[in-house]
Amino acid sequence: MSAQGHRLTAPVNSEKVYIVLGLSFALISITFLLSRSNLPHVGDNIHSLPHGGAYRDGTKAVLYNSPNFGSRTSLSNGKNAAFAVVLLLSLLIYGSRCLSQRNHLCACGNNHSSH
């Protein structure tokens, strides 16, 4: 065998295959999670009222509330609770800063009063 018969070739770069597989898996996962219904099953085998509502026919009357009925004005609402936490933390930081009467060493090396 001669040395010219064996050529060295670089291994196949399979990075693009893994990128396509990862993006495909992410797209399928996102599609699955966004297309499924997480609402509770409300109603009977014929009438489904997942968002609440009323149904009446000759033999039956059904009235279902919406899933979050009754919690619209309380602090258990996510936006109100987050706002309350941010406001409370801001007030605590401001209060602790105002109550401290000590001098603080600045990054420039000088002592500055906190007020």
Curated annotation (Swiss-Prot):
Keyword terms of this UniProt record: Host endoplasmic reticulum, Host membrane, Membrane, Transmembrane, Transmembrane helix, Transport, Viral movement protein
Spans within the Lumenal topological domain: 35-74
A Pfam match: Plant_vir_prot
Record's keyword annotation contains Membrane: yes
Keyword Transmembrane helix belongs to the record: yes
InterPro entries: Plant_vir_prot
One Gene Ontology term from the biological process aspect of the record: transport of virus in host, cell to cell
Residues that span the membrane, as ranges: 14-34, 75-95
Localization terms from the record: Host endoplasmic reticulum membrane
Example of a GO cellular component annotation carried by this entry: membrane
Cytoplasmic face of the membrane: 1-13, 96-115
Extra remark: TGBp1, TGBp2 and TGBp3 seem to act together for cell-to-cell propagation. TGBp1 is the main movement protein that physically cross the plasmodesma with the viral genome. TGBp2 and TGBp3 would facilitate TGBp1 function.
Function as written in the Swiss-Prot or TrEMBL entry: Plays a role in viral cell-to-cell propagation, by facilitating genome transport to neighboring plant cells through plasmosdesmata,.
UniProt record similarity statement: Belongs to the Tymovirales TGBp2 protein family.
UniProt name for this protein: Movement protein TGB2
Organism: Potato virus X (strain CP)
